[in-house]
Every structure is written in structure tokens, then in C-alpha cells.
A protein has these predicted regions:
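Short, well-structured alpha-helical interface segments that form or flank functional binding sites
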Residues: 5, 9, 66, 70, ...
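Catalytic core of Fe(II)/2-oxoglutarate
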Residues: 96-97, 101-102, 106-122, 127-185
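Proline-centered turn/helix-capping motifs that create local helix->coil transitions or kinks
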Residues: 18-19, 82-85, 130-134
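Charged, low-complexity, helix/coiled-coil-prone segments
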Residues: 2-20, 95-107, 128-130
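Non-heme Fe(II)/2-oxoglutarate
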Residues: 1-78
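A structural signal for short, well-ordered beta-strand segments and their strand-loop junctions
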Residues: 1, 22-23, 85-89, 94, ...
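Non-heme Fe(II) oxygenase catalytic core, chiefly the N-lobe of the double-stranded beta-helix
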Residues: 51-118
């Protein structure tokens, strides 16, 4: 990671959307980089989680690290939001798969956690598909999706962090144009 003071300065200098992008977020071994996520994918459930832990330990360790106190402290310093708490149940999170033709309408995420009395404050997206070149850019927008602030290519090991507010409109409204045997994660 960047030193926290430099990362925070850059984060604060971004648009009012307040986002930050890290390339090469985590160190993944080459054998986990080569689309292995496709071979074990099923909708997120306990069995999939257990297979992820065994088949892709670096990805699993990343998920654990994102919930660690050390990483939460980094996010607190980066964003200036104190008292962050990990969502260990991945409510609204986890690993998402999007196939050919898929898209995600522009939207803002819920702010209040559906089962706990907590506010959702930050989104972290980490892209896991190598050699991506099939649309599906993450669009960050303002004014209810009318003004695109940024369009981010979902390249492998790129992380995007942004505040979760009613105004943090995001999505990938342009459908993916990938071969049927490839999905975006």
C-alpha cells in the first residue's frame, strides 16, 4: 500500500464521489491468476466459501485481510471515517459473477445494514478476472446517474474503494461483451 498520509491526501483530492483506485492491490500467485475462479464458481454459499479457501487461498486470505483490524485502520486513516466495523457475513458482498451480456444498472447501495444496527460506509471492489477487455467498466456518477465522474476498467487485481452514500451512484450499465466461457469477477 501507499503510505497512509499520501493515500489519504490523494483520496481527499478526488471528486466529491470520494473514490480511490489501487492497481496490484494484493499479491496473487500466478496459478491463482489464470481464471481459476471460473472452475469452482457457484452462487455464494458455505460450500463455495470452503472451496475458495482450499482452491484459491490467496483470494481467501485477501477476503480475511479486508475484514482485519489492520486493514480497517488503514481505511479509517484513508477515508477519515473512524470506528469502521467489518461485515464478516458479506451482506451485499462476497464474490459476484457477471456473464456475457450482463450489466449492473446505475444505483446507490443501501446505507443501513439489513440485519444489524450499523451503517454501511465504504465499498471495496476487487476485480479478479485476468486479461479483461470486454466492457463492463465501473461507472461512478453524480446527480442520480446523469453525470459520469469516472469510468474504471475492471482489470485484474484492481481495487476501487468509495464511500457509500445515497449519492454514490455506480454500476456498469454497458453489457459485457465476452466469450460465453468467460465471466467477470
Amino acid at each position: 500500500f501507499l503510505p497512509t498520509d499520501i493515500a489519504k491526501q490523494c483520496y481527499n483530492e478526488m471528486s466529491q464521489h470520494q473514490d480511490w483506485m489501487f492497481d496490484s492491490m494484493m499479491g496473487y500467485p500466478e496459478d491463482e491468476r489464470d481464471s481459476q475462479v471460473n472452475k469452482w464458481w457457484t452462487p455464494y454459499d458455505t460450500e463455495s466459501k470452503n472451496r475458495l479457501e482450499v482452491d484459491m487461498p490467496a483470494v481467501w486470505k485477501s477476503l480475511e485481510y479486508f475484514n482485519s483490524r489492520q486493514f480497517l485502520m488503514f481505511l479509517e486513516k484513508l477515508t477519515g471515517i473512524n470506528g469502521l466495523i467489518a461485515d464478516v457475513d458479506y451482506e451485499g458482498g462476497g464474490i459476484h459473477r457477471i456473464k456475457n451480456g450482463g450489466r449492473l444498472e446505475l444505483h446507490s447501495d443501501y446505507n443501513k445494514h439489513p440485519t444489524q444496527d450499523m451503517w454501511r460506509r465504504i465499498n471495496l471492489l476487487l476485480y479478479l478476472t485476468p486479461d479483461w477487455n470486454y466492457n463492463g467498466h465501473l461507472d461512478l456518477c453524480e446527480k442520480e446517474g446523469l453525470v459520469k465522474v469516472k469510468s474504471i476498467l475492471p482489470t485484474f487485481n484492481r481495487a476501487v474503494i468509495f464511500n457509500t452514500t445515497d449519492d454514490s451512484i455506480h454500476g456498469h450499465p454497458t453489457p459485457l461483451e465476452c466469450p460465453d466461457n468467460i465471466s467477470r469477477y
